[in-house]
């Protein structure tokens, strides 16, 4: 409004200026007052009175706070005192209780000490009683050689109204084995103790266990290792006697196991791989199966007591002169070395091949070697992976002749081999059979089988075995050196002509049977496909296979050498004439085989399927030439004949060449019937 008034008043009027001067003068006065007041305030703040007042106020406030905190602390301390008093009252109560606990502790300690003292006294008494028992047992007559520790002591038990103990049975059994001359033990109170004490005792023939069901026959040689059985034979003389028919079947396995252990001793030096399957065959499980087979095949009339057997031996069995163990071992070792020499080249060749393909061949090879060492079979193997050619137990025929010089020399060689087998059979004085259950079933048609209903008649086979040995002795001296020299010469010439065509899977030649390896290497056989049907199929289709036997050379793929062709030509002519005789003998054996157990036929069918599968496996790995010819030509079903003069591969030329010519078949039929 002043502006409006000023604007209204003209600038040149004196009132305006007067009013303006007044206002400015009042402004100056107010400013001075303000400055004075500020100076006074500053001075007051800088004075001591103000500072003292401020400190006083602060101290007063602090005093108030301290008084309040003191009050709070006093109340808190009062509470703490009350709590401590309560805790002290509890502690006093607990101290009174601990006194009672200490009293109980002392009482319990005294009781525990008393119990420990009583237990110590009882333990000393028990130890004294054990020592007294041992002293009493020693005074009662325990043998010093069979002294036992306290851990093996067993209390006496009452059995069948009599008081017995393990220690007394051990003493009785040890005294039973200390007889100065060879005896026969027919009671086994403890089989494990028998195994331990048999090494220091005399050699026994058999051990019959009298059980509640039947009288079974145990094999003597429980030792799996061949060295252990050989050491037993070196400690005591080996005796053998002419046994009766009922005893003979029980004792068939004894000599075979003894020879088998010695052959394992010689074979273990050549290859360690062959011992493990043979040990499995000699394991306790296989021996128990042997006992089951013996007990099932025997009848109630064959159950013999110990007294009956001893009386029967004294009456009708004069003892044979004992044979020194050293000579027996030397002859057996020599014969095993001569037999296993054909295997050296084949095993060396197969060692460089893959292990998968060697497994079936090694299995069949071990079965072949076991049959060589445990029976009197003449087995010739030229197989690779699965091929086994067997010619079981050929009998000698002095009147038989072959056309050609090579055939005559082969026949002489067979007679020499047969004589060695027969001599080893004569030393054992028993007809040996294969020890394993599978081998017994497989050779049931080749070995003499005694039915439960047959009467004991051992004179005829024993007499014929003697004639067999006598005829073989006549041929031994003159034939052995000549046949060895001729075969060495022929094989040396053949090795010189051998070409590079012969591969490791398809080449075929006769295996070397010489003991010396002077530059003569074994040839590698070809892969042949064999399928073995059962006996019933063989008899039904036997007459229709004559044409196949004559034309077998065109059906079997084989790489022939010159020496092999010469031997084949010399023998095929006579083989045709002998075919009809073989089928007649097969028909004659059908009636004999009809009485066999049904289980053997099932086993043969199983064996046929196994061999057929292995043959198909080996054919898949054969040479290209063999596979090509197998596609064009049908597979021949080779028959497995029943008697000893017919092997499983009767269609092969090698089997025809090595088989002796039997014109006198009546004696052989009587011998094995």
Swiss-Prot record:
Positions bearing Phosphoserine: 317, 321, 647, 650, 652
Start-end of Polar residues biased regions: 196-207, 255-266
A Gene Ontology BP annotation from the UniProt entry: spindle organization
Record annotation: effect of changing residue 379 to A: Abolishes phosphorylation by PLK1
Residue ranges with Basic and acidic residues bias: 267-293, 303-316, 331-357, 471-480
Subcellular location as annotated: Cytoplasm, Cytoskeleton, Microtubule organizing center, Centrosome; Cytoplasm, Cytoskeleton, Cilium basal body
Chain intervals for the UniProt region annotation (Disordered): 175-207, 255-413, 432-480, 494-516, 613-673
GO molecular function, one term: protein kinase binding
InterPro entries, per the entry: Centrosomal_kizuma (IPR026742)
Gene Ontology, cellular component aspect: cell projection; centrosome; cytoplasm
Chain positions with Phosphothreonine modification: 379
Bias-annotated ranges (Low complexity): 503-512, 613-625
Keywords assigned by UniProt, alphabetized: Cell projection, Cytoplasm, Cytoskeleton, Phosphoprotein, Retinitis pigmentosa
Record PTM: Phosphorylation at Thr-379 by PLK1 is not needed for centrosomal localization or pericentriolar material expansion but is indispensable for spindle-pole stabilization.
Effect recorded for residue 379 to E: Phosphomimetic mutant able to partially restore focused bipolar spindles to PLK1-depleted cells that otherwise possess aberrant spindles with diffuse or multiple gamma-tubulin signals
Domain of life: Eukaryota
Disease field: Retinitis pigmentosa 69: A retinal dystrophy belonging to the group of pigmentary retinopathies. Retinitis pigmentosa is characterized by retinal pigment deposits visible on fundus examination and primary loss of rod photoreceptor cells followed by secondary loss of cone photoreceptors. Patients typically have night vision blindness and loss of midperipheral visual field. As their condition progresses, they lose their far peripheral visual field and eventually central vision as well.
Assembly and oligomerization: Interacts with AKAP9, CEP72, ODF2, PCNT and TUBGCP2.
UniProt record similarity statement: Belongs to the kizuna family.
Function comment: Centrosomal protein required for establishing a robust mitotic centrosome architecture that can endure the forces that converge on the centrosomes during spindle formation. Required for stabilizing the expanded pericentriolar material around the centriole.
Other facts noted in the record for this chain: Kizuna means 'bonds' in Japanese.
Name the record gives this protein: Centrosomal protein kizuna
Organism: Homo sapiens (Human)
Gene of this entry: KIZ
């Amino acid at each position: 409004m002043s502006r409006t008034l000023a604007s209204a008043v003209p600038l040149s009027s004196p009132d305006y200026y007067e009013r303006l001067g007044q206002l400015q003068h009042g402004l100056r006065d107010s400013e001075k007052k303000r400055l004075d007041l500020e100076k006074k305030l500053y001075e007051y703040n800088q004075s001591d009175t103000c500072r003292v007042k401020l400190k006083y106020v602060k101290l007063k406030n602090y005093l108030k706070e301290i008084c309040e905190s003191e009050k709070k602390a006093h109340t808190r301390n009062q509470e703490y005192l009350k709590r401590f008093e309560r805790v002290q009252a509890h502690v006093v109560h607990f101290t009174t209780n601990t006194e009672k606990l200490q009293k109980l502790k002392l009482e319990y300690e005294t009781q525990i000490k008393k119990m420990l003292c009583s237990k110590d006294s009882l333990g000393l008494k028990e130890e004294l009683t054990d020592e007294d028992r041992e002293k009493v047992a020693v005074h009662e007559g325990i043998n010093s050689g069979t002294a036992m520790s306290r851990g093996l002591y067993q209390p006496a038990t009452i059995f069948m109204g009599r008081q017995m103990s393990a220690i007394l049975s051990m003493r009785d059994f040890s005294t039973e084995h200390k007889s100065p001359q060879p005896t026969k033990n027919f009671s086994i109170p403890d089989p494990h103790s028998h195994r331990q004490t048999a090494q220091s005792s005399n050699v026994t023939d058999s051990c019959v266990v009298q059980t509640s069901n039947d009288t079974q026959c145990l094999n003597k040689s429980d030792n799996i290792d061949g060295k252990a059985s050989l050491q037993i034979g070196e400690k005591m003389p080996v005796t053998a006697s002419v046994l009766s028919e009922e005893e003979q079947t029980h004792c068939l396995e004894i000599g075979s196991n003894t020879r088998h252990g010695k052959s394992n001793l010689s074979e273990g030096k050549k290859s360690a791989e062959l011992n493990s399957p043979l040990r499995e065959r000699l394991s306790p499980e296989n021996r128990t199966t042997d006992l089951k087979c013996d007990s099932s095949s025997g009848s109630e009339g064959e159950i013999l007591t110990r007294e009956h057997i001893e009386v029967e031996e004294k009456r009708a069995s004069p003892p044979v002169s004992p044979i020194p163990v050293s000579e027996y071992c030397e002859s057996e070792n020599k014969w095993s070395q001569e037999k296993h020499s054909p295997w050296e080249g084949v095993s060396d060749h197969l060692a460089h091949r893959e292990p998968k393909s060697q497994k079936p061949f090694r299995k069949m090879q071990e079965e072949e070697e076991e049959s060589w060492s445990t029976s009197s079979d003449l087995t010739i193997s030229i197989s690779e992976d699965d091929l086994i050619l067997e010619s079981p137990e050929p009998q000698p025929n002095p009147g038989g002749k072959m056309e050609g010089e090579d055939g005559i020399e082969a026949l002489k060689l067979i007679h020499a081999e047969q004589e060695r087998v027969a001599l080893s059979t004569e030393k054992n004085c028993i007809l040996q059979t294969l020890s394993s259950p599978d081998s017994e079933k497989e050779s049931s048609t080749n070995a003499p089988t005694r039915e439960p209903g047959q009467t004991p008649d051992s004179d005829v086979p024993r007499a014929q075995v003697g004639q067999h040995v006598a005829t073989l002795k006549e041929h031994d001296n003159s034939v052995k050196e000549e046949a060895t020299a001729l075969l060495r010469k022929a094989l040396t010439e053949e090795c010189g002509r051998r070409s590079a065509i012969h591969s490791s899977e398809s080449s075929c030649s006769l295996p070397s049977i010489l003991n010396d390896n002077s530059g003569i290497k074994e040839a590698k056989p070809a892969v042949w496909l064999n399928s073995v049907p059962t006996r019933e199929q063989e008899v039904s289709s036997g007459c229709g296979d004559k044409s196949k036997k004559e034309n077998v050379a065109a059906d079997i793929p084989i790489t022939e050498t010159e020496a092999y062709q010469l031997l084949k030509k010399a023998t095929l002519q006579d083989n045709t004439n002998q075919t009809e005789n073989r089928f007649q003998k097969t028909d004659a054996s059908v009636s004999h085989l009809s009485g066999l157990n049904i289980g053997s036929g099932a086993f043969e069918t199983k064996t046929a399927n196994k061999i057929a599968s292995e043959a198909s496996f080996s054919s898949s790995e054969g040479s290209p030439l063999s596979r090509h010819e197998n596609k064009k030509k049908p597979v021949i079903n080779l028959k497995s004949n029943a008697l000893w003069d017919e092997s499983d591969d009767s269609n092969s030329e090698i089997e025809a060449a090595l088989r002796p010519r039997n014109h006198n078949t009546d004696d052989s039929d009587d011998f094995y019937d």
